[in-house]
A protein has these predicted regions:
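Fe(II)/2-oxoglutarate
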Residues: 1-164, 358-368, 375, 379-393
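Catalytic core of non-heme Fe(II) oxygenases with the double-stranded beta-helix
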Residues: 3-13, 18-28, 38, 42, ...
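Generic preference for well-ordered alpha-helical elements
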Residues: 36, 66, 70, 90-93, ...
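Generic hydrophobic, helix-prone segments enriched in Leu/Val/Ile
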Residues: 91-96, 113, 147, 207, ...
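Non-heme Fe(II)/2-oxoglutarate
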Residues: 119, 127, 131, 135-242, ...
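Surface-exposed loop/turn and secondary-structure junction residues enriched for glycine/proline
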Residues: 122, 207, 212-214, 265-267, ...
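Short, charged low-complexity intrinsically disordered segments located at boundaries
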Residues: 209-221, 257-264, 366-371
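C-terminal "cap" of GNAT-fold acetyltransferases
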Residues: 334-344, 367-373, 382-383
Length: 393
């Protein structure tokens, strides 16, 4: 679900749930159940959000909807429900979302739940150690040293600013990269032999695996919370809000009989982590063409930066950085990608119109306005000076 879809669903839900006490959910629709006390409390949402209330974090729960939606919706819960436990609130909000979401969305949610349950109940993991974060085993020493003290000086000791909004650093050990590649291959074989259809990571990828669907979401969320979010709050404070709190994690493959390149696009993220896992390959360079907000995503290209991928090396970039991947010319290339999101930034973004702190288009417009204002002021002062001279003579 995109951020715009999430906001429209939230507005629709709010309007339908206000004052509602008689609508019943489809008895054939499986959904989370809350206690009767919670169900009674949640029937009537607030008309305006409680801005003083600090919402819970829901990223670690198995939810059918984006955790960001739960954080936004929580501000509209009645006071007596706000004092309930986090689980009770999550159940009540899940019930509301399932009741009032469009039928197509309910069907999508149900199908994805069944899809994931089928994988988790049948898939035989190849490397069990991948499913729990082991920093010493996964990361190179220089990366661990840099993040042991979350100061800007520490980060910059290993992190290079390749271009505005783009940072590179050594991150993953070769053994981890090879294990993850083998796990991805095992996932694909499982799908092939089970004769199941695979949900691909994005709409522009024909190949690749959503790692979260195979049970790696817990490990990746730990990676986000303990490492990527603290780093990003130093490097990208303008889009991290109070922290990055949810993710979409996947592996993408390039090569013969796979995707050969990746078209020009922006990610549905605040910050994106892209790590080359290997193998032997030629080509596949990443190219970046500037950070833009929604209003300027198709604006003129003035920024140009190309990056040659190195196994184990990470690229951490602004999610709104327009980018793509050039065609691979030989071998096979596998990447670990995490779209990292901030629910607090997305909530605040709804009320913003100017993003000149990070959008090249907004920055140019702001500069042009300032220059026009200076020019107009100079013209006024000139006229006043001319008028004063005329009067004196």
């Amino acid at each position: 679900m995109t951020s715009s879809d999430m906001n429209s669903n939230l507005n629709r839900l709010r309007s339908m749930a206000l004052g509602s006490s008689s609508k019943q959910s489809d008895p054939h629709q499986q959904q989370p159940r809350a206690s009767q006390e919670t169900l009674n409390a949640r029937l009537k949402l607030r008309r305006t959000p409680n801005e003083e209330h600090e919402p819970e974090h829901y990223e670690d729960l198995q939810l059918d909807f984006n955790p960001s939606l739960f954080r936004s919706l929580e501000r509209f819960l009645p006071e007596n429900l706000l004092s309930s436990t986090r689980i009770e609130k999550a159940r009540a909000m899940s019930d509301l979302l399932l009741r009032y979401s469009p039928e197509s969305e309910r069907i999508r949610v149900q199908k994805h739940r069944e899809y994931r349950q089928n994988i988790l109940s049948s898939y035989q993991r190849l490397h069990e150690e991948l499913y729990t974060l082991h920093p010493v085993s996964f990361f190179v020493p220089s990366f661990l040293d840099a993040v042991s003290n979350t100061s800007e000086e520490n980060f910059k000791s290993i992190i290079g600013r390749a271009a505005p909004g783009i940072y590179t650093f050594d991150m993953l050990k070769p053994q981890f990269c090879q294990m993850l590649i083998a796990e991805v291959e095992n996932m694909e074989k499982w799908f092939h032999y089970s004769k199941s259809s695979m949900m691909r990571p994005t709409t522009i990828n024909k190949f690749g695996v959503v790692l979260d669907d195979f049970g790696l979401d817990g490990m990746l969320q730990k990676l986000l919370g303990d490492f990527i979010s603290p780093i990003s709050q130093v490097l990208f404070p303008e889009v991290c809000g109070t922290g990055l709190d949810s993710h979409h994690g996947y592996a993408i493959e390039y090569g013969k009989y796979r995707d050969t390149d990746l078209g020009f696009h922006v990610d549905d993220s605040e910050v994106t982590l892209n790590v080359c896992l290997g193998n032997q390959f030629s080509g596949g360079e990443l190219y970046f063409r500037g950070v833009r907000c929604d209003n300027h995503v198709n604006s003129e290209i003035k920024e140009n930066y190309d990056y040659s991928q190195v196994p184990g090396q990470a690229v951490l970039h602004h999610g709104r950085h327009r980018h793509g991947a050039r065609a691979i010319t030989a071998g096979r290339l596998v990447n670990l990608v995490m779209w990292c999101r901030s629910s607090t930034f997305r909530e605040a973004k709804r009320y913003q119109k100017d993003f000149s702190s990070w959008c090249g288009g907004c920055k140019l417009e702001k500069h042009n306005r300032q220059q026009a204002a200076i020019k107009a002021t100079v013209e006024v002062l000139k006229r006043r000076g001319a008028d004063k001279t005329h009067v004196e003579h």
